[in-house]
Amino acid sequence: MEIKKVVVGYLEENCYLIKEGNKGLIVDPGDEIDKILNMIGDTDIVGILITHAHFDHIGALDELLKVYDVPIYYHNVNKELNYNKLVDVKEQEYEIDKFLFKVLYTPGHRNDSVTYFIGNNMFTGDFIFRLSIGRTDLEYGSDEEMMESINKIKRYSNNITIYPGHGKDTYLGFELKENSYLQ
């Protein structure tokens, strides 16, 4: 598995391409469709994963769907996204082509926030960042739900790589040790 990242938009959101052979998944197409398409190249996109519906994570979604007619995976609890191929994810495993992934509900930053667990990698959106966590003071945010989500991921292996919605990649073990919000 190969993971590529492009930073997009004025909020510097991380959009990811997860590749297996020539197949790929896109995570959080936030903005700047040209940068995203350049990262994709000739990869055959088979799905789009959305961690939550803030504008900086879905800003290029409509443009991307004009190029790729693929399913969108998202926890549509607030009924904010309305697409024909929307898969309203549950907390379970999914298989798309060559990809097997697990969805974890990780509300706190927003009530629609999910983490995608693929291989030894977590795509956390704005749930966990390197040495920080997502804000809980915005619409649909909750301190209590954030703490429940943090406790949920503590059971996973320390060597899991975290790919956040903003900033640098990190490891779960490092965050559990050094991130004061996870103590």
Where are these regions (language model features)?
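Conserved beta-strand hairpin/beta-sheet module of binuclear metal-dependent hydrolase folds
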Residues: 1-43, 114-125
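Active-site-proximal loop/helix segment associated with metal-binding centers of metalloenzymes
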Residues: 8-13, 17, 21, 76, ...
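Active-site HxH/HxHxD metal-binding segment of metal-dependent hydrolases
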Residues: 24, 31-100, 181
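Metallo-beta-lactamase
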Residues: 24, 111-183
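Histidine-centered catalytic micro-motifs
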Residues: 48-58, 105-113, 163-169
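Active-site-adjacent C-terminal substructures of enzyme catalytic domains
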Residues: 78, 82-85, 105, 113, ...
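Pocket-forming structural segment of enzyme catalytic cores
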Residues: 92-93, 99-115
